[in-house]
Amino acid sequence: MSDARGDPERASRAVGDWFTAVYDDLTIMATACERELRNSRGTKARLTERNLRAIQPAATDFLGRHEVPVAAGIVVGPNVLGNDLGAVEWWRRGDSGSTQRIVFNLSPDDPGFYDFVTFEWFNEVVSTGKPAIQGPYLDYAGMDKYILT
């Protein structure tokens, strides 16, 4: 994008092209996640939290194709897994390049509860059914680190 400096239209196109490429690849990741979840669930009526771990290869592949996103995964709304809380299955690329699972605190009575259903990024996607860009904002509760999203 450095070649676009000084030309707002080219800079805007470069940013738009970057986001388009990432969103296109997220569609590929979503398809892979869907396949892995279906295979993991097998003949059971509902997914379980344990089934969600099957998305690790898709998240790892996505992160391997992109330098900027350092974490990827899926967010499952309340009642999809047969619980009232939903789930976040998120994988982060470490310094070594390997992926580690991030565990979110989804217990409403605990300090540091990650109440994702109240966040604008979750509600916009649920209400529109389309990808959304939110931020930038600092998200402290999500990964116990300050991250710019």
Model-identified regions with their sequence ranges:
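Juxtamembrane extracytoplasmic/periplasmic/luminal helical "stalk" adjacent to the first N-terminal
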Residues: 1-50, 147
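Short alpha-helical segments and helix-capping/turn motifs at coil-helix boundaries
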Residues: 10, 54-60
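Short regulatory alpha-helical segment in sensory/regulatory domains of signaling proteins that mediates
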Residues: 16-18, 34, 59-67, 125-126
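Residues that cap or flank secondary-structure elements
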Residues: 50-51, 113
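Amphipathic coiled-coil/heptad-repeat helices and related helical stalk/stem segments
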Residues: 55-56, 117-118, 148
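Extracellular/periplasmic ligand-sensing ectodomains of membrane signal-transduction proteins
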Residues: 65-131, 136-144
